[in-house]
C-alpha cells in the first residue's frame, strides 16, 4: 500500500522575493496607503460628523502630519500613543495577540543623482497603546482656566496685541487685522470662554497669514475656525461655538491632494501656535516653581 499524502505545511513557506519583487511590493503598499489617505480626505469633507471626529484625532495627535492623522483616523481614530513593534518591545510592552498594525508614512532622506538630499516616504507599521498590555498614558494636564489661557495665548502671540473698545464685528471678542499685523482684543468682555475661543481662532488667522505667501480672511476663515476648535479642544475649553459643521462647498469639491494640502496648512498653523503656548506654559510653570523655592 502506498501512502499518498501531502505534508500539512507544503507550499506554506513564503517565497523569498527578489530585490525587484520586494521593491514592487513596497511600491504597491505605499500606493495603497496614499489611496487610503485620499479616500479618507474626501470622506471627511463630505460628512460634518466625520470631519469633527478627524479634528479631534488631529488635535490629540498634533505631532503627526495631516496625512498621517487621516491614516490614523481611518484605522484607529481613538489612538493616543503610537510606536512600532521594536519600540514597544524596548519598553517591555507586548502587543496584544491579533492586533492589527496601523500604517502611516515615515519620511526618509536619500541622495539624488545630483548629490542633493531628497525626501521620500516609506510605510511604517505602528500600534497604539490600547493594542498592548501597557498602561494608557494619563491625559495631559491642560490649563482649563480660560482667563489664564487667554493670557498665555496673547503672551505667545506671533503678532502685536492691542486692547480696544470696538471691533469691526460687534459679536467678536478679538480680531486679527492683517494689514496692521495686529491682534485686537476687546476690553471688558465678561465671558472668558468666548474670549478664549475668539483669541484662538484669530491667532489661527494670524498664523495662516505668517505661513502663507498670500492671505485672504474670507478664503482662510474655515481653516481659522478649525484651528480655534483644535486649540480649545486641546486646552479643555468648550468648543460648541465653533461652526466646524459648515464645511465650505469649495473645500468639499476639491481633489483629494488639494484637501490634504489645506488640512496640512491648518495642522501646521495649529502646531505652531500650540508649540509657543506650550513653551509659555512651561516658562510660567518654572517661574512659579522658583517662587515656591524662595
What do the predicted segments below correspond to?
Residues 2-294:
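N-terminal accessory/interface modules of nucleic-acid-binding and processing proteins
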